[in-house]
Structure formats: C-alpha cells, structure tokens
Amino acid sequence: MSKDEYLITDAPLKALTVFAMPMILGSFFQQVYNMADSIIVGQFVGSSALAAVGACAALTNVFICVALGAGVGAGVLVSRYFGAKEYGKMKTIVSTSLISFLLLSIILGVFGFCFSHAMMSGLQTPADILEEAVLYLRVYFVGFPFLFMYNILSTMFTSIGESKIPLGLLIFSSILNIVMDLWMVAGLGLGVFGAALATLIAQGISAVFSLLIFLYRMRRYQSPFQWFDGRKLRSMLRIAVPSVLQQSTVSIGMMIVQAVVNPFGTQALAGYSATMRVENVFSLIFVSIGNAVSPYVSQNLGAGKTERIKKGYHAALVLDVCFAAVAFLVIETLHTQISALFLGKDGTALAYQVSGDYMRWIGYFFIFMGIKMATDGVLRGLGIMRPFLIANMVNLAIRLSVALICAPRFGIAFVWLAVPAGWLANFLVSYAALRNSWPGEKVEPSRIFS
C-alpha cells in the first residue's frame, strides 16, 4: 500500500490529524502572510493606512473565493479518482482545471484592475483613505493570476493526501513577504504600495514553485491522459459552481457588512478590520479541518470504504472542539494585546473598543463554526452541493439582516452579534441534509462523474 493512501488505510482520527495539522499550520502562515501588511502598515504608517488595507479585504475575499470554489470542484474529482487509482482520469482533471482556471484568473484580474476605483467607491470607503485603498487593490489584481494558481495547486496537493508541501511553500512565502514588507514599508517608506508589492512578489514566487513541484510529483503516476477534456470540465463545474456561488455570495455579503461599518468612521473601521484579521486566523483553522474532511471522504468513497466516512466526521468534530477551546483561551486572555498589534499607538479608544468587543464575542462561539465546517466538508466530499449552498445562504441571510437593519439604528455592535447564530443555523441545515445522505454502498466514480 502506497504511503500516499493513508487517508483510506489509517485510523480515521490519526489520518485526519496527520493530514489536517499541516493544513492548520498552513492556514496560520497564510494569515501571517495576510496580516503582515496590516501589522507593518499599522505600526509604521498609521491607522488610516491600516484602514485603507482593511477596506480592501472584503472585496479581495470575493475574488479569492472564486479561486477556492474552483479548486473545490477540481479537488473533489482528483480525490475520488485518486482513491479509485484511476490516475489517467485524475491527471486529465488536473490539466483541464489548470488551463481553464488560469484563463479565468487573467480575465478576473483585468476586470478587477480596471474597476478598482468604482468598486471601492461603491463600498462607501471613507474619502480620506479611498485613493490608498484603490492603489493597494490595483497592485493586488496585477498579481491575482499567481494567487489563483497557488490556491488551485494547493487544493490539488491536498486532494492526493499531500499537505506538507503547501505548508513548506506557505512558510517560505510568509517569511519572504514579511521581510519585503519591512524593507519596502519601513525601510523605503513606500507605504501601502510597498505592502501590496511585497505581497505580489511573494505570491508570484510561491505560485511558480508550487507549479514546478506539482508537475514533478505527477510523474509518479504514470498513466495516459488528455490535456483538456470538456466533459471533465463540466463535471468539475457541477461541483465548483455551487461552491463558488456559496463562497462568493458570503464574501459579497461581507462587502455589504463592510459598507455598513464604513459610515461609522475611519477609527471604527480600523478596529473592525483588526478583529476581522484575528477572526480569519481562527476561522481558517476550522476551515482547514473541513477542507481536510473533503478529500478524506472523497478518497474513501472512491475506494469503496464508505464505512470510514462517518468515523472521519466524528474525528473532525473532536479536533474542532479542541481548537475552539484554544481559541477561547487565547482571545479571553490576550485580546487587548492582539488589538495593539494592529492598531499601534495612534489607535483611538473607539478603535480599541470595537476591536476588543468584537473579538471577545466571537471567541465564545467558535465551536459553532467548527461543527459547521466539518459538516460542510463531508457534504462537499460526497458531492452533495445543493444543501451545502442553502445552509450557507441561511448563514449569510442572518448576518446581513441583523447588520443592515439593526447596526445603523442601534450601533456597530450589531454587525457581529448575529455571527454565532448564523454559524449555528448553517450547521443545523447541513446536518439535516447529511443525516439522509450517508453512503451505504460502493460508488464507482466513473459512473457518477463521467
């Protein structure tokens, strides 16, 4: 038995832990990679520049989610065929997805660059930070194809049970990004432009290395394949489109929430942006566990080992409980110090209050996000996308309705008060669908996805 096949042979808790831990560490470094801009800009340029970078986050997340959703469609099929040892079909999926999605990323990058000013103005970005925010965003879109390629390749690696290589690449690019941030922002005084340029260069180098390593890895699986297959692309899109819609719609919803926050002023936005970064750090731990569950489920389904799927789900829930407890303890004891990392000395009392209140509130309820992500991961791995999409729309509807209706009337706190309720509702809808969807027999991947 190949060492690559441990997701279908080892004990579920052991297999998921071994697989998920590099992904969790990778998520941490991904956020270090993202937070480096915010921390360094906040410390060396000021809270207004921090707000400019933070104002771009909701919009850039929409485009990132397109890349992540596209990766889900390819990743589910790669895992399924890998588990079934149909390596020719697996390599056809890989080639088809890289060609198709690279073209898509170029189109989206050009669109984003051309309409950066219009999009940021539409989000009611405060006038005193608008030009810096647009500058940061345009540099981001120049490098968008690199970001897209890296995310697709990272999903490919995890789909074949390899989570250590993406971790190594993330550590490398994170360190490079921080060094270049310090040089360009603190040393050369390039401000927001320097932070964006440092990120672009680090992403580009990481994407090229990822491609070279992945192509070398594919030589291990000798089997004839097609460079492009329209039927396989349609199979990918049947899974990818609901995932793109879900992730993009949620991010668009967060853009709307951003528009609700912006009128409260630059300092409130700075505090909100600081805690959004912190929420993303802990959220991506649970996202990583959910992302680990998907290839675990897909590989075992392809191998006909359906009895292992429910055991893997329970193992993921155990990991979620452990990390939720850690998140609570860290936030409860260090929330002020964490806020200071971003806001620096010129952060006002309002910025610190917004950041601290938001951070402590979500710290109590991360367990809801954990069980939601694990359940969603199983649904994705099984290819059951409609309930997955509906559940996430319910989550978004709760967050948006409370933010839009209550925050302008009763205060900014209502932006985050509904977050745990949305997570819990999402889990309940997803779990209701999952209870009726556990597979009970061997499923041939070629029969489902051809």
Could you describe each region identified by the protein language model?
Residues M1-A20, V78-G143, G187-V241, V297-Y364, ...:
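Short alpha-helical transmembrane segments in multi-pass integral membrane proteins
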Residues G71, Y140-T158, P166-S174, A195-V208, ...:
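Short runs within selected transmembrane alpha-helices of multi-pass transporters and secretion channels
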Residues V62-C65, N177-D181, S206-L211, V281-L284, ...:
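Hydrophobic transmembrane alpha-helices of multi-pass small-molecule transporters
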Residues F28, V32-L50, M120-A127, W183-L190, ...:
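Helix-terminus/linker motif at the lipid-water interface of multi-pass membrane proteins
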Residues V18-D37, V139, S173, A202-S206, ...:
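Transmembrane helical elements of multi-pass membrane transporters/channels
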Residues L50-V110, L147-P166, G271-H335, M369-G383, ...:
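Small-residue-rich hydrophobic transmembrane alpha-helices
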Residues T9, L13-V32, A36, L59-V66, ...:
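Residue-level signal for short hydrophobic patches within transmembrane helices
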Residues V18, V41-N61, A127-E132, V192-F193, ...:
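Interfacial/gating helices of multi-pass transporter permease domains
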